[in-house]
């Protein structure tokens, strides 16, 4: 089936921000003005189109990345609305991996907030061009210029104003477009009637100053424009737009617009900016991968006549269609009902149906082309991060990396009937979410589920009950500790069994040594002269890995360790993979015990926003929680306190903060790093254990 929309007229964008900056409201307005919905849904009354999960509607937050398609000025815009809560950072990460551009929404009162920093860095990692939208210009304390400054200082980025606001707070009525030098105001509540007015006299100086900065930036993007500018010639609107687009696509500058989505002001110019300044799939570099046949790097260009390649970025279980896989087509075309090759798993898959998504509504289509973001039913083996390709031209695109979970809870089914259902349900939820992990404790028979934060696990448990009808008892949250070593040790593992007939023989000598924090695990084979035959080396590594899943102090996973196999011996008849695996496991346990093992705990980056009257009390409380204050900042009568605090000390903090600040303080926290548990705390834990 032929392509309906040319690639140059396609935009794949994300909407990203801190929680409560107004992303979902902005998306709702975009859907309204592009004619995708005929009434505006509000987040606060649970009617937002893009927040379609029950949990999202109840909490007024976005949890999953909902995808939708809309049209503006004969352009097709595929939008992914991403969550702002730190527990769902993985949703942002996997969306940014498949997008070409993004709208970064900031609260014009608060400026850059902690999660906006995280999301901005994620977008930097994938070099995603962005336009900035300063939302909530109608709120008390909204400050366009101060917010721009905070983008510059906190993010180290270069924002460039393409609009400035007409008024602020309750006097915010419209904008001045610096590209066209025109002022306009909104004359109706729905924001559909826009009237041009003369630029107010008191703003002519500000307009001249910021337009000059814009023209200077535009001139720097192109030699011809620079000559024109230096000769004092007028740059046309077209010249200016070309310059802004060039700087945006190069991820050097970030055009800044403003508005109030809730008051229906500023969304149409934002859509114009998406079309004018953000990239089409043809503007971004070819996607890189590894050719499976040759092992060499290969590239795929966004063209329909290239071999098919796509990246699965999300898997979800839909109550009506079953397993639904979202993927981005990077090159080529795929038809409904056709076979594709999962190059990551090296398996053939059949696409049952292709679906164009609109939040949770779907429209069946016959084919997907390069640049499309699409849902597919029928892919049995594909999981998040897998590459789909043409079997004749297999390629593996760079997969996504996800953070390790930091918090766990024990979960038990209430009845025997719930037991089987719970296993299936947890497995399905783990398929959807790469940061959600399940572990069974053989000794206690308990199931441990782990995630990125309390809210993350709360949502999982809620979904178990509502979607899968599983009744379960939930334990108290537990911290995902790890163990590591501080010293170097050598140990020997010898496994010999003789029970008549063929025996078992495995013998290894290994050395363990610490790695830098966050480096994980490394295995090094230093065998010379075949004292341990090559065919047994993988079994040794497997034994080592299995032994490190349970440390010698408390049974927590051992991290940041290098294990080297340095010596050993074998028996020509009795040696086997099993014997070497067991010998390696025995050696590692001994070596770790002799290498000064220590306990590691997750440290969270905490930001508390509160009135200055309560600062002393809150700081002393954070100190009592083993917190380390890293920064304090003043914003009017508000103080921002930043600290690194162990997760173990943060349970119940929200309630404590509310009572200490009479409900006027709030906090956000996100995982930062692992650090050694102080000896006195570790000793207490050992006595309890």
From Swiss-Prot:
GO terms for biological process: ribosome disassembly. The keyword Lipid biosynthesis does not apply. It is found in: Cytoplasm. Residues 8-282 form the tr-type G domain. Keywords: Cytoplasm, Elongation factor, GTP-binding, Nucleotide-binding, Protein biosynthesis. CDD domains: EF-G, EFG_III, EFG_mtEFG1_IV, EFG_mtEFG_C, EFG_mtEFG_II. GO terms for molecular function: GTP binding; GTPase activity; translation elongation factor activity. Gene3D superfamilies: 3.30.230.10, 3.30.70.240, Elongation Factor G (Translational Gtpase), domain 3, P-loop containing nucleotide triphosphate hydrolases, Translation factors. GTP binds at residues 17-24, 81-85, 135-138. Pfam families: EF-G_D2, EFG_C, EFG_III, EFG_IV, GTP_EFTU. GO terms for cellular component: cytoplasm. Catalyzes the GTP-dependent ribosomal translocation step during translation elongation. During this step, the ribosome changes from the pre-translocational (PRE) to the post-translocational (POST) state as the newly formed A-site-bound peptidyl-tRNA and P-site-bound deacylated tRNA move to the P and E sites, respectively. Catalyzes the coordinated movement of the two tRNA molecules, the mRNA and conformational changes in the ribosome. NCBIfam families: EF-G (TIGR00484), PRK12740.1-3 (NF009379), PRK12740.1-5 (NF009381), PRK13351.1-1 (NF009891), small_GTP (TIGR00231). Belongs to the TRAFAC class translation factor GTPase superfamily. Classic translation factor GTPase family. EF-G/EF-2 subfamily. This is Elongation factor G.
């Amino acid at each position: 089936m032929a392509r309906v929309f040319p690639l140059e007229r396609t935009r794949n964008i994300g909407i990203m921000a801190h929680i409560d900056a107004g992303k979902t409201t902005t998306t709702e307005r975009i859907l309204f003005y592009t004619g995708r919905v005929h009434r505006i849904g509000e987040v606060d009354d649970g009617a937002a189109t893009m927040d379609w999960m029950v949990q999202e509607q109840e909490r007024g937050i976005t949890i999953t990345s909902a995808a939708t398609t809309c049209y503006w000025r004969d352009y097709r815009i595929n939008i992914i609305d991403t969550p702002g809560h730190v527990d769902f950072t993985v949703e942002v990460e996997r969306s940014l991996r498949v997008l070409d551009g993004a709208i970064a929404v900031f609260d014009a009162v608060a400026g850059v907030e902690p999660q906006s920093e995280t999301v901005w860095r994620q977008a930097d990692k994938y070099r995603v061009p962005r336009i900035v939208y300063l939302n909530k210009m109608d709120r008390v304390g909204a400050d366009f210029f101060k917010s721009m400054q905070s983008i510059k200082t906190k993010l180290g980025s270069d924002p460039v104003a393409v609009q400035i606001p007409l008024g602020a707070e309750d006097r915010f009525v419209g904008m001045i477009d610096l590209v066209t030098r025109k002022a306009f105001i909104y004359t109706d509540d729905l924001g559909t009637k826009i009237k041009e007015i003369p630029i107010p006299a008191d703003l002519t100086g500000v307009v001249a100053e910021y337009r000059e900065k814009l023209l200077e930036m535009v001139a720097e993007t192109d030699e011809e424009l620079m000559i024109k500018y230096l000769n004092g010639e007028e740059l046309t609107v077209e010249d200016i737009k070309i310059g802004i687009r060039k700087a945006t696509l190069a991820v050097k500058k970030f055009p800044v617009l403003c508005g109030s989505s809730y008051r229906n002001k500023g969304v149409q110019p934002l859509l114009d900016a998406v079309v004018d300044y953000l990239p089409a799939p043809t503007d971004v570099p070819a996607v890189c991968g590894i050719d499976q046949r040759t092992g060499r790097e290969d590239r795929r260009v966004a063209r329909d006549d290239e071999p098919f390649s796509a990246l699965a970025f999300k898997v979800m279980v839909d109550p009506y269609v079953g397993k639904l896989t979202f993927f981005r087509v990077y090159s080529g075309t795929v038809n409904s009902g056709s076979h594709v090759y999962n190059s990551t798993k090296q398996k053939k898959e059949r696409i049952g149906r292709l679906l164009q998504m609109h939040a949770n509504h779907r429209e069946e289509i016959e084919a997907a082309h390069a640049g499309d973001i699409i849902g597919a039913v029928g892919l049995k083996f594909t999981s998040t991060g897998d590459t789909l390709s043409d079997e004749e031209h297999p390629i593996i695109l760079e997969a996504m990396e996800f953070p390790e979970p930091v918090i766990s809870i024990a979960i038990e089914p209430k009845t025997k009937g719930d037991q089987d259902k719970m296993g299936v349900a947890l497995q399905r939820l783990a398929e959807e979410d790469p940061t959600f992990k399940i572990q069974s404790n053989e000794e206690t028979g308990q199931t441990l589920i782990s995630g990125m934060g309390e809210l993350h696990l709360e949502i999982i448990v809620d979904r178990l009950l509502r979607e899968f009808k599983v009744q379960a008892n939930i334990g108290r949250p537990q911290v995902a500790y790890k163990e590591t070593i501080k010293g170097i040790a050598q140990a020997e593992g010898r496994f010999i069994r003789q029970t008549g007939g063929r025996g078992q023989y495995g013998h290894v000598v290994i050395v363990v040594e610490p790695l830098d924090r966050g480096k994980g695990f490394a295995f090094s084979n230093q065998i010379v002269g075949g004292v341990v035959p090559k065919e047994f080396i993988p079994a040794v590594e497997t034994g080592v890995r299995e032994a490190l899943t349970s440390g010698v102090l408390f049974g927590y996973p051992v991290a940041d360790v290098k294990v080297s196999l340095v010596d050993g011996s074998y028996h020509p008849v009795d040696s086997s993979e099993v014997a070497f695996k067991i010998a390696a496991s025995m050696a590692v346990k001994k070596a770790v015990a002799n290498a000064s093992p220590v306990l590691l705990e997750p440290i969270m980056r905490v930001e508390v926003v509160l009135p200055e009257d309560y600062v002393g009390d809150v700081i002393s409380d954070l100190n009592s929680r083993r917190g380390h204050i890293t920064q304090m900042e003043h914003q009017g009568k508000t103080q921002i306190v930043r600290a690194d605090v162990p997760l173990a000390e943060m349970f119940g903090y929200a309630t404590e903060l509310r009572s200490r600040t009479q409900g006027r303080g709030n906090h956000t926290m996100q995982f930062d790093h692992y650090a050694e548990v102080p000896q006195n705390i570790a000793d207490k834990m050992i006595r309890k254990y």
